[in-house]
Amino acid sequence: MINHKFDAETTPLYFYFALKRSYEIYAVYFLLLIICITGFGYPLHALPAAGWLIVCLLARYYINHTFIRWNLLFYVTISAGWICYFLYYYGWETGATSFILPLLLVSMFSLYDTLFNKIAFTVFLFIMRMALFFHCQTHPPVYVLTGIHILIIQILNTVVFFVVTSV
């Protein structure tokens, strides 16, 4: 247990480090994604990933300066926002839906949420995934990537998914 100076209660060390490591992993992910998208010849398309990288680094920095509950909310917002953005702009085939599972795990292992909140969050993630699925099935992505680009992004997303899930 760690006494987080901004919380009235103690924070389990594993939860604190899981959030901290997740931010670090996502920062590396966004950096690699910027390199990939720029390498594909679309440097302007990398700007949103650069924005998410900055937000992720700020959230990582402020993990020691804000309530752990707020950090959990930041993590969920960063992740859910990225999933929605990425699927909308690059399509279903890129594997971004995999990042829903770490969100579900963080919620389930959070000591700060009631059972009702955990169930409500699970329903929210389910609805979000289904809405994104139906959208991607009925609309083409904004940026159409080539087959090899989709493969590279799919591999990157799969590797990062397994790494972030393992923390």
Positions of predicted regions on the chain:
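Alpha-helical membrane-associated segments of multi-pass integral membrane proteins
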Residues: 106, 114-118, 157
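The cytoplasmic-loop to transmembrane-helix boundary for the fourth helix
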Residues: 111-133, 150
